[in-house]
């Protein structure tokens, strides 16, 4: 399998398995390589665990980071643990034991202890004679999902056909799949599910179910009829008034999924038959221009001063203009009324985004896609581009505020954007060209400059771009040149090292370009910048620094004035080099620790950002977007929260299919989401509002049995919740939380 997996960041660099005894920086458990994994996930698993999924374990504890305490903490007159920092303030009557007791905190399931998985515990030397307790490791070793599928595999030639009218099998007599439909139904599959009133939710919504006879609800859309010759035939039932064109494929037939690239286009990409004229021209010019810039930069200062006017003119003539200028971009808008759902690896799947849009998210992003696998036509990477039809509707905006962006047309705007990662300019530029060509419903293409994954960082992508500002500028400038009308944006962190923020310089370069290119080429054309208020080194061991985000927001607001100072006043800058022409306004979005409408409004009003991007807060309570819209804390009941689980399940079956494999996929991603959602503490049992994202729940009982179940940190209870809608799990299905901490790092959410 290892031979088939190349480095998705830079194919010229081989994947490096950890040496024996080498300590890994991140605490990730060994995981099997799954067919549906994206390229970066597959490569990371090879690097961490080797090619066979065996764990690398030298018997020593995993590397852990020191927990950084909040500043200005004032202890009470009594024991400072009476009000435990980092523990949600649950009312006493709901605590299983007092909040300061050992069992309410230390004996809580290790899945609740963020520090065990993400930071090195400080310990409490007042206990056990000053000796620190030994903490559980922050990894689940040998994490596996198992496998699931039908006992007998039904041939696709009959899976969607009537019993007596199968399609021609392309394998003929050599086919190893079952062609006897009645035998398959009797012996080759598990019994129909009885959830959802025994009715297929996919068929109920779309009038067809392309899982056909493999559907776990097939009894609700099939029947047995008597033919003229007296034979009884099994047939599938469709509602032609509601179904799409089944010949187009699964998503197109359902009509709810967009941005589906054709198989032919993916094959052409894999065979390098897809023409990329713009990218080729631009990268050729970029290489030539870079050589001349480097030559001039290497001249000593005295050499430059001694140059005659004729030599200076000759040097200017060496510079060649770009082969073409960017197309004028579609206007975009970010405002207080447009909360943004962050790009989330694994969790940011289509069903979850669909649920968040339904609850009020105005802007969404795909999971981070790697440029090289996209250019190679890999199915798993292009699958990340799929969006639900609700994501391609215009965001809700305030017409009074949208006037800030002249010529903004809300009817042409949409919610869904994509995020990519690249380590070299040509990768980002070519990926931007193919995305703008093959993905028709795309709001923006966002360049990830904050991903802290070691594999990505080591190859020069993600947060490594923060330390390579010239390369970052070339990427943004080139992507802007080839992306047609699709705007280019960037997501950055404060910097790579704690205490050494570099966002000021990064933002200035994204806004105006470097000094070596500013005068000749103008602005790079970055339409929006999102700043995550942490460094790469910090990860999630400290609260996001919103004071620094506010300083950066002030810098962005001064953009128009600085633009006037830095551009040639004699010649009006070309509108096509500006991000939101003709205004040239860069939108600025803040990201980090938003968990309530109060946090959101505070960041808008006091930090001065245009909008706020929400990540973990939305995973724990997706109705955060509804709270932002209504301006109040919503105390969702257990039954309401269970309805969201049901919706996710319905959306998952529609996205991944209602056959055995699709049910297993839906269950897996539901459990991944519940590993976050169980951390929610109902507002009605908290002593203080608003809640804090950094607070972990103590051991408590809910207001009813269902609320207690939803709060369980035992993944077997999450399995019970999944069985309410998906029935008993397949005997081969396995699941363990990705970390013992349910708030494991969303690594690609840079």
UniProtKB/Swiss-Prot annotation:
Citing just one GO molecular function, the answer is: tRNA-dihydrouridine47 synthase activity
Q: Name the InterPro entries for this protein.
A: Aldolase_TIM, DUS-like_FMN-bd, tRNA_hU_synthase_CS
Pfam families hit by this protein: Dus (PF01207)
Basic and acidic residues: which segments have biased composition? 17-28, 62-73, 118-130
Q: Name one GO cellular component term.
A: nuclear periphery
The entry's localization annotation reads: Cytoplasm; Nucleus
Q: Which residues bind FMN?
A: 343-345, 419, 491, 532, 591-593, 615-616
Q: Which keywords does this chain's UniProt record carry? A: Cytoplasm, Flavoprotein, FMN, Metal-binding, mRNA processing, NAD, NADP, Nucleus, Oxidoreductase, Repeat, tRNA processing, Zinc, Zinc-finger
User: Superkingdom of this entry's organism?
Assistant: Eukaryota
Instruction: Name what cofactor the protein needs.
Output: FMN
Which parts of the sequence are C3H1-type zinc fingers? 155-179, 200-221
Tell me which Gene Ontology terms the entry assigns under biological process: mRNA processing
Q: Which residues form a coiled coil?
A: none
Catalytic activity line of the entry: 5,6-dihydrouridine(47) in tRNA + NAD(+) = uridine(47) in tRNA + NADH + H(+); 5,6-dihydrouridine(47) in tRNA + NADP(+) = uridine(47) in tRNA + NADPH + H(+); a 5,6-dihydrouridine in mRNA + NAD(+) = a uridine in mRNA + NADH + H(+); a 5,6-dihydrouridine in mRNA + NADP(+) = a uridine in mRNA + NADPH + H(+)
Q: Where is this region: Disordered?
A: 1-145, 292-319
Active site per UniProt: 451 (proton donor)
Catalytic EC class: oxidoreductase
EC number(s) on file? 1.3.1.89, 1.3.1.-
Q: Which family does it belong to?
A: Belongs to the Dus family. Dus3 subfamily.
Q: What does this protein do?
A: Catalyzes the synthesis of dihydrouridine, a modified base found in the D-loop of most tRNAs. Specifically modifies U47 in cytoplasmic tRNAs. Catalyzes the synthesis of dihydrouridine in some mRNAs, thereby affecting their translation.
Tell me what this protein is called.
tRNA-dihydrouridine(47) synthase [NAD(P)(+)]
Q: What is the lineage of its organism?
A: Eukaryota, Fungi, Dikarya, Ascomycota, Pezizomycotina
The gene designation is dus3
